């Protein structure tokens, strides 16, 4: 069988114990990066002694103001680049694989696309911290003018540590604890009311903190976002928000607690990976009708929060997907007609395409019916494919031009049949030690990582504006894990 033959040839390099025999492997001494104490040095774009092909130019903002789709691009030399830096070189410089590699300029470009789209509107861009909670990423977004959307007390603490303006932060969630709500009240962030007991807890927290809390009502508009059921949040079966049949009860209750809370707006969130902006328009139309109804009862509403959820091109098919400008233009007139401040909560569309998950191939095998590429990354570091059946584009960092192409499942070392990063992917057969990346890994990947099988969370790096690489999170170590057991009684 042809596939079996090419797999046999692919496994031959495994017999050579000398890793330097792989022509694409970069000597760690040849590349430098930010060290543990924060010093930064540039990474050379190419370490070849031959005259290299020029790397692709770093992605720039499109003429119409839309952010470019991808910052990771294949060069004429066959290597994968991030903003002009070879990913192969980043692998040689990293403390270990797997790791996450970001483009800092792409984060800026993505935010700029939202900022430009919101021109002419009063607005708050509230970054969904749950998508990616790296402190350096948060600090960058705060510097750009982002607020923060939070769903736990620790996310609130992290946002405050990152320097976010509390008056541009929103505390969401269907199970907020009293302790976390007291912190929210003391901090001065907006708080969304999600249920009857949530309202009671918010009032109690306001009294404990001695602060009047600005609140929004999270109304479930029962709009089908046409996405995976696990990421749909605005339909009638969702655990989030209040049903419109109960709206009057909440309004009456809020009036009775006027010394403790102030109703300042309404909120909805439809789901995630949404690729049709008319869904946002339909929801916004329902929400402004609620605004009219609530204002008619004497409430002075200022804010309309339409949530987030804009999808991205995970399949890398160059499909025409809605942009931030498309999204905002569908609701612009509705917002202006009611003189509202618009709050949006992007997460995935701000951060997903800025990052890839970089792995090293452990080996290639076949069980007679399936071909497998086994890598050192796994569902522990990136669970979306296992959890949602999600597709993320996968490619080799520096494939050999002579490698035969076959269909593979890309799997990790975790002791679960569900441990896969991709299935049925046509790829050149890689050598042992080759680099393999999972694209669009900036959102809901590292933030959902676990220590299952005692796989420790990986390091993170980003490419700076000047082409240098900086470590933005160190990898967890076994010693870090053991510290949880220090000084415990026998």
Curated annotation (Swiss-Prot):
Reaction(s) this enzyme catalyzes, per UniProt: meso-2,6-diaminopimelate + H(+) = L-lysine + CO2
Main location: plastid
Keyword vocabulary terms for this entry: Amino-acid biosynthesis, Chloroplast, Decarboxylase, Lyase, Lysine biosynthesis, Plastid, Pyridoxal phosphate, Transit peptide
Database matches in InterPro entries: Ala_racemase/Decarboxylase_C (IPR009006), DAP_deCOOHase_LysA (IPR002986), De-COase2_C (IPR022643), De-COase2_CS (IPR022657), De-COase2_N (IPR022644), De-COase2_pyr-phos_BS (IPR022653), Orn/DAP/Arg_de-COase (IPR000183), PLP-binding_barrel (IPR029066)
Active site location: 415 (proton donor)
Positions bound to substrate: 348, 384, 388, 416, 444
Boundaries of the annotated transit peptide in chain numbering: 1-44
EC supergroup of this enzyme: lyase
GO biological process, one term: lysine biosynthetic process via diaminopimelate
Keyword Chloroplast (UniProt): yes
EC numbers on record: 4.1.1.20
Region annotation (Disordered) ranges: 45-66
Pathway terms, separated by semicolons: Amino-acid biosynthesis; L-lysine biosynthesis via DAP pathway; L-lysine from DL-2,6-diaminopimelate: step 1/1
Annotated GO CC locations: chloroplast
Modified residues (N6-(pyridoxal phosphate)lysine): 130
GO MF annotations in UniProt: diaminopimelate decarboxylase activity
Subcellular location: Plastid, Chloroplast
Role of this protein: Specifically catalyzes the decarboxylation of meso-diaminopimelate (meso-DAP) to L-lysine.
HAMAP family: LysA
Family: Belongs to the Orn/Lys/Arg decarboxylase class-II family. LysA subfamily.
Oligomer status and interactors: Homodimer.
Name of the protein this chain belongs to: Probable diaminopimelate decarboxylase, chloroplastic
